[in-house]
Amino acid sequence: MPSPTVTSPQVAVNDIGSSEDFLAAIDKTIKYFNDGDIVEGTIVKVDRDEVLLDIGYKTEGVIPARELSIKHDVDPNEVVSVGDEVEALVLTKEDKEGRLILSKKRAQYERAWGTIEALKEKDEAVKGTVIEVVKGGLILDIGLRGFLPASLVEMRRVRDLQPYIGKEIEAKIIELDKNRNNVVLSRRAWLEQTQSEVRSEFLNNLQKGTIRKGVVSSIVNFGAFVDLGGVDGLVHVSELSWKHIDHPSEVVQVGDEVTVEVLDVDMDRERVSLSLKATQEDPWRHFARTHAIGQIVPGKVTKLVPFGAFVRVEEGIEGLVHISELAERHVEVPDQVVAVGDDAMVKVIDIDLERRRISLSLKQANEDYTEEFDPAKYGMADSYDEQGNYIFPEGFDAETNEWLEGFEKQRAEWEARYAEAERRHKMHTAQMEKFAAAEAAGRGADDQSSASSAPSEKTAGGSLASDAQLAALREKLAGSA
């Protein structure tokens, strides 16, 4: 039985149309473009020197590594990966080797120019990433290379630009020239614009008398500027401290965190006046709060005037010892009793807060001196209830004469005050002994020069103590000799 004949299937040309239709169908699968056109494609290969891009052309396009990014000397693998969809500009349809040469960065450049020009027209900011530090400034990737001069990076000149690498920042476009491929940016202009808006809103919400925290941003001869959070206010040198200072650096340094009070907000001039000392207790009020009339305090003679001597009793606090309060005897001039720089225990006889004056007495302090230590005279005033009973310190058990557990802080504070009062009594004792010795020496000299000297002349040596006190002190000195 003969085998069946196998015949190949026949396909008529008419099944796919005419030959013209066939060529047209093939033609539709091939993209046609010219130099300078922007095409889209898929990354199919990434090499060290180049990247291959499938754009549906008869051959794959080649993007040289230098045409991948506006950054210099980049690794292609850091820019693209296989499978990425990208745009590229046709540089050459066919080079000497017959390759289609493309540029990714040029495509970005062309697209970016349109965006940049539109932003410039609207006076809007552009956002980009800092990719390089060059001579004179920074290079930003804004789709093309934008130059940001160092003088326009911040409100103040920045010396070290390296920390900006990799940061995304906004800037205004101040110069644009496509023919020269020149784009100049200014972050300072953007900061001025945005900060002006923020400043206006901030100032509207800033009320006189409010307490704010800030950071010292700069120091000048006439004061210190404090950043309150985007807005700087001035603390005039007279508002930095209750005491006299010659320069702001005596009180604050750049970077210091401070608490200030708002003294004034000038909306028209957009200026804020601040005070540092207003947030601190007035030393005069502090002195008045912690000292009582009649208390004996240590001080140092700072100045002599015809009518008395000024004595500093605390930092920034000076009181006057009137010439009549220097000694029991008549004093012609203050330097007969004290000299500038002398330590002196003086008695507080008046505090005038309104006039900021303190009256002191050296004479009364010495009259009140007793060898027996009385803490109340030196700052530890006794407290009594309405029935006249002594009020013991908090945490002290009067029955056992012991401090209770849990009151260690109160005990430490009380003992510190007691120790300070005791120290002052010792200073007072030393002062009395010193002048007793001086009086004794002065009287001995007078006895040798004139046996008939008048009593007033016998005291010409400058005693600071009464006769009774001097007698008691002479006995003490004689007993310890």
Swiss-Prot record:
* GO biological process entries: translation
Locate the compositionally biased regions of type Low complexity.
437-456
Q: Where is the S1 motif domain?
A: 36-105, 123-188, 209-277, 294-363
Q: What is the effect of changing R357A?
A: 2.7-fold decrease in binding of POA, decreased binding of tmRNA (expressed as residues 285-481)
What keywords are annotated for this sequence in UniProt?
A: Repeat, Ribonucleoprotein, Ribosomal protein, RNA-binding
Q: Which GO terms describe its molecular function?
A: mRNA binding; structural constituent of ribosome
- Quote the function comment for this protein: Binds mRNA, facilitating recognition of most mRNAs by the 30S ribosomal subunit during translation initiation. Probably plays a role in trans-translation; binds tmRNA (the product of the ssrA gene). In trans-translation Ala-aminoacylated transfer-messenger RNA (tmRNA, product of the ssrA gene; the 2 termini fold to resemble tRNA(Ala) while it encodes a short internal open reading frame (the tag peptide)) acts like a tRNA, entering the A-site of the ribosome and displacing the stalled mRNA (which is subsequently degraded).
Q: What does the sequence similarity comment in the record state about its family?
A: Belongs to the bacterial ribosomal protein bS1 family.
Tell me what this protein is called. Small ribosomal subunit protein bS1
Which source organism?
Mycobacterium tuberculosis (strain ATCC 25618 / H37Rv)
The gene for this chain is rpsA
